[in-house]
Amino acid sequence: MVTKKAKLLHVLNNVYFKKTEPVSIVHFLTNRCNARCSFCFIDFDDPNTFKNELSLDEIDKFTKSLGKSLLNVNLTGGEPFARKDIIEIAKLYIKNTTVQSIYVTTNASLPDRVESFAKAIIDFDKNIELTFQISIDDMPEEHNRVRKMSNLFESCIDTYQRLK
């Protein structure tokens, strides 16, 4: 069994000398999103926008290729919880890499999925550091208007309450 000290030495060697393995990555899981934020860069009118998501098999191969220095992954998108397999994706990172923290950016429109994800990941690995960024741009009325979703602000608060 590899000790924490040995893992840290491997990461430090990679960061300062070899520089061949990532320490942190941002994985853009999907362009799909249930909001239509006025500032978003995703072109929802382009028919190719929602093509080319990586399959679980592709993500499995990808995570196995990342080496043993990965400490953090940021799962983002569109709305990462639009992918029903987000739990399996996170588990692949935990299983196939040395990731210690998972950071998820969400519009918090799907509180049930967010809560299920948090419970499943903590049950899978109690040592993983799990962080959520819930996007709130303004007071309730303006937040909902800009993101073109009614009750989204309230959903953000609901999601936060479930996670705390």
Name these PLM-found stretches.
Residues I89, E142, S155-D158:
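Residues within well-formed alpha-helices
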Residues V104-T105, M139, Y160-K164:
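Conserved strand-turn element in the central/C-terminal portion of the radical SAM core barrel
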Residues F39-F41, H143, F153:
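Aromatic side chains
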Residues P80, A108-D112, Q133-M149:
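Conserved radical SAM core fold
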Residues M1-V2, Q161:
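Polar low-complexity intrinsically disordered regions
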Residues R147-K164:
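Glycine-rich S-adenosyl-L-methionine
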Residues V2-L130:
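Conserved alpha-helical substructure of the radical SAM core
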